Each structure stands twice: as structure tokens, then as C-alpha cells.
């Protein structure tokens, strides 16, 4: 999920999706062959499809869909808010426990407020049920392209935050969607009342009136914000 820029400035605007908020995943029953580990004969991974360095978790398989190997997914962001990555990417990496598999998706589409898809090699309902609980990753490079001055949250997490005077304010630890716009949760080293080190926190709205530049190459966000706010 992500938010919207409610200011007039175009710079600093975030699209309506980005980093993904994990949703609860239904746990498969402990017994039953169809609910066990991912079927290694159905979904395979080979050296040419090793786990990508830019893998981002975008959803999870929650159930089978129909009888022909389709699966139902909970996207960590809804369609148009991150679920688009599930719809666009055709190469998926699945992780269930310690086991990782690659799947070439033949079809993916919206179904109500969920995404349903057909991973290649998933031939029937039992095969699909075996995938239940698997976390779904795609390459960051397979995310849909964004317009200029739009950013995925996943690309903002970890950036340094400085103000226009060059004062370091901390590092983006998380992004929050308050329903109106996005908020950067910025962490910085601080000292508690007992004199012990602790982690301080700043909440800075990710809107154009405060965010003056997002310099991804430099690894920083420049804001109109004072250290004592």
C-alpha cells in the first residue's frame, strides 16, 4: 500500500501502491496430502531461475480456485495498489517454509477484490491446494512502470532523510497510509531519559508541501522539516 500526495507540488508524490503490507494468510491443515509441501513435480526451480536479488514479496496463496490448477491470492496491496505487480509479472518465486520454487504464470486476473492465477505446472485442484500458504515474490524489475515523480514505497524504505539545511533527520523505516496520504516513519539514534541509547521516531507526511526531493541515486529524501519538530 501507499498513499497520495495531497499537496500541490508534484515532486514527492507517491503512487497509490508501493511497499506491501502483509495480510494474514490462511494456514493449511496439518494433514492431507494435498495440503503438504509444494509439489516438486508440479512447480520447479532450476539454475536459470534462481532466487532473484531484487525479489519483493507481493502476496500469498490462500486457496485453490476452481478445479484446473488455479490459485487464489491475497495481495499485500490491493489491485491498483500493488496487486498490479501480481497481475503483470509472469515469473513468480514461491516460498513455503524453507522450500523455494519457481513458477511461470500462464494467466492472472482480478476476481472481485482478490487475484487469481494459473501457475504453470499446477494441473488440478490438489496441486493448487499444495501451494496454499506459499508466499509469492516477484522481481522488483517486473513491477509496472510509474510516471515521473512517482515512487514505490519499497524504493523509499531505507533512504536517508535530510532537511534543506542538510541536517540529518534519520532513515525511513516504514511508510504508513493514513487513508488520506502517506507518512514516512523516520527512525534516528537518540538518548533516553535514563541516558541509555534508544531509537527515536519522526512522522513526516509524504506530501509535496514537505517533501522537496526524492534523490534515489543519492539515497536520500530532502524535506522541509526541522529536527525539533
Swiss-Prot record:
The PRC barrel domain binds ribosomal protein uS19. It comes from the Bacteria. Residues 1-21 are annotated as: Disordered. Keywords: Chaperone, Cytoplasm, Ribosome biogenesis, rRNA processing. NCBIfam families: 16S_RimM. The gene is rimM. It is found in: Cytoplasm. This is Ribosome maturation factor RimM. Disulfide bonds: none annotated. Residues 148-229 form the PRC barrel domain. Belongs to the RimM family. An accessory protein needed during the final step in the assembly of 30S ribosomal subunit, possibly for assembly of the head region. Essential for efficient processing of 16S rRNA. May be needed both before and after RbfA during the maturation of 16S rRNA. It has affinity for free ribosomal 30S subunits but not for 70S ribosomes. Binds ribosomal protein uS19. One of its GO terms (cellular component) is ribosome. One of its GO terms (biological process) is ribosomal small subunit biogenesis. InterPro entries: PRC_barrel-like_sf, PRC_RimM, RimM, RimM_N, RimM_N_sf, Transl_B-barrel_sf. It comes from Burkholderia pseudomallei (strain 1106a).
Amino acid at each position: 500500500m501507499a498513499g497520495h500526495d495531497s499537496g500541490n507540488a508534484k515532486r514527492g508524490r507517491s503512487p497509490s501502491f508501493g511497499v506491501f503490507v502483509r495480510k494474514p494468510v490462511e494456514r493449511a491443515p496439518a494433514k492431507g496430502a494435498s495440503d503438504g509441501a509444494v509439489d516438486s513435480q508440479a512447480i520447479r526451480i532450476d539454475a536459470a531461475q534462481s532466487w532473484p536479488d531484487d525479489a519483493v514479496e507481493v502476496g500469498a496463496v490462500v486457496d485453490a480456485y476452481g478445479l484446473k490448477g488455479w490459485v487464489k491470492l491475497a495481495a499485500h496491496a490491493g489491485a491498483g495498489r500493488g496487486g498490479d505487480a501480481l497481475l503483470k509479472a509472469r515469473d513468480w518465486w514461491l516460498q513455503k517454509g524453507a522450500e523455494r520454487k519457481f513458477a511461470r504464470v500462464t494467466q492472472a486476473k482480478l476476481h472481485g477484490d482478490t487475484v487469481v492465477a494459473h501457475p504453470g505446472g499446477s494441473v488440478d485442484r490438489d496441486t493448487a491446494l499444495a501451494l496454499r500458504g506459499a508466499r509469492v515474490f516477484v522481481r522488483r524489475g517486473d513491477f509496472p512502470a510509474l510516471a515521473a515523480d512517482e515512487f514505490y514505497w519499497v524504493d523509499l524504505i531505507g533512504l536517508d532523510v535530510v532537511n534543506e539545511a542538510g541536517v540529518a533527520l534519520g532513515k525511513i523505516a516504514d511508510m504508513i497510509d493514513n487513508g488520506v496520504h502517506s507518512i514516512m516513519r523516520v527512525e534516528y539514534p537518540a538518548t533516553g531519559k535514563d541516558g541509555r541509547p534508544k531509537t527515536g521516531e519522526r512522522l513526516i507526511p509524504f506530501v509535496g508541501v514537505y517533501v522537496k526531493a526524492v534523490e534515489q541515486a543519492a539515497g536520500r529524501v530532502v524535506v522541509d522539516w526541522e529536527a525539533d519538530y
